[in-house]
């Protein structure tokens, strides 16, 4: 997908309740390159979520991390400037120890801002 096409999708997302766009593809399929191109073209902030979130989670005991994770992710997003935030390397959200529903969490944080997230996997029919 070209970044101009993605830009149109981002604009269209502004009017939706969940302002979430997923760039879905297998590992090493170019998702990060698309996000980095958006950084250059549109100046959107880019967050390596696994890196930033893992650093923040170290501040909490293991038993509290599951409960605090949604608020921590929301705070990470809130600390960025801009209406559209690009999230890459979201694999930490799938860690079974954190007991999260990654899609639901991304939907939740996308209610107030456009979120473009790189999602490793495939989309078949209506199944992610």
What do these predicted regions represent?
Residues 80-98:
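Conserved P-loop NTPase "ATPase switch" module shared by AAA+ and STAND
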Residues 16-33:
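Walker A/P-loop nucleotide-binding motif
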Residues 40-56:
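Conserved catalytic segments around the Walker B and adjacent sensor/switch elements
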Residues 34, 38:
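Hydrophobic positions on the alpha1 helix immediately C-terminal to the Walker A/P-loop
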Residues 1-16:
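N-terminal pre-Walker A segment at the start of P-loop NTPase domains
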Residues 51-78:
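Short glycine-rich substrate-engagement loop in P-loop NTPases that contacts/grips substrate
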């Amino acid at each position: 997908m070209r970044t101009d096409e993605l830009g149109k999708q981002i604009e269209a997302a502004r009017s939706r309740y969940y302002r979430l766009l997923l760039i879905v593809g297998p590992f090493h399929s170019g998702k990060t390159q698309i996000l980095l191109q958006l950084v250059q073209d549109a100046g959107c902030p880019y967050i390596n979520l696994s890196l930033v979130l893992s650093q923040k989670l170290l501040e909490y005991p293991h038993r509290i991390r599951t409960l605090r994770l949604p608020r921590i992710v929301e705070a990470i997003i809130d600390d960025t400037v801009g209406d559209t935030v690009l999230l890459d390397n979201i694999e930490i959200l799938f860690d079974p120890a954190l007991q999260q529903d990654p899609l639901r969490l991304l939907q939740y944080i996308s209610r107030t801002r456009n979120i473009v997230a790189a999602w490793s996997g495939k989309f078949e029919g209506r199944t992610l």
